Amino acid sequence: MSPAAGVPEMPALDASGVRLGIVASTWHSRICDALLAGARKVAADSGVENPTVVRVLGAIEIPVVAQELARNHDAVVALGVVIRGQTPHFEYVCDAVTQGITRVSLDASTPVANGVLTTDNEQQALDRAGLPDSAEDKGAQAAGAALSAALTLRELRARS
């Protein structure tokens, strides 16, 4: 899997000691399971032992569980997929999840990386899921972003 255009290469991270929480939905299980596998691999490769993993049914439940994880974790990864349908439901769910994740991150001063795919169709989600024939691994990217931000915050807070 070669990186997509414009995607920065993730440097090797030493995140040992970082407490990582991962919340992943179960809708579109093949995709969400792959996103979770990518996030777990990045965590393990970065020295994170035993991240807390919580599964929820749908994407709309992700922010409240991320909020609870942010209470006692240094970083949180939110994973899921919302695929456009025939009704405005797609926009409502995408907006609620995105705003919820952002609010949790800011309110808790804890990085919550948004790895929730919002796509027009299932193929677009599969292309981003980190499967062997996928173009990208958004689960891995989200985990890398969360861990990198947690390390940056740790460094900034140590200066204070």
From Swiss-Prot:
Positions bound to 5-amino-6-(D-ribitylamino)uracil: 27, 59-61, 81-83, 114
GO cellular component, one term: riboflavin synthase complex
Top EC category: transferase
Record pathway: Cofactor biosynthesis; riboflavin biosynthesis; riboflavin from 2-hydroxy-3-oxobutyl phosphate and 5-amino-6-(D-ribitylamino)uracil: step 1/2
InterPro entries according to UniProt: LS (IPR034964), LS/RS (IPR002180), LS/RS_sf (IPR036467)
Swiss-Prot/TrEMBL GO biological process terms: riboflavin biosynthetic process
Example of a GO MF term: 6,7-dimethyl-8-ribityllumazine synthase activity
Catalytic activity: (2S)-2-hydroxy-3-oxobutyl phosphate + 5-amino-6-(D-ribitylamino)uracil = 6,7-dimethyl-8-(1-D-ribityl)lumazine + phosphate + 2 H2O + H(+)
A matching Pfam family: DMRL_synthase
Binding site for (2S)-2-hydroxy-3-oxobutyl phosphate: 86-87, 128
UniProt EC number: 2.5.1.78
Active site: 89
Keywords assigned: Riboflavin biosynthesis, Transferase
Record-annotated disulphide pairs: none
Residues making up the signal peptide according to the UniProt record: none
Similarity comment: family membership: Belongs to the DMRL synthase family.
Subunit structure: Homopentamer.
Annotated function: Catalyzes the formation of 6,7-dimethyl-8-ribityllumazine by condensation of 5-amino-6-(D-ribitylamino)uracil with 3,4-dihydroxy-2-butanone 4-phosphate. This is the penultimate step in the biosynthesis of riboflavin.
Name the UniProt record assigns to this protein: 6,7-dimethyl-8-ribityllumazine synthase
Record gene name: ribH
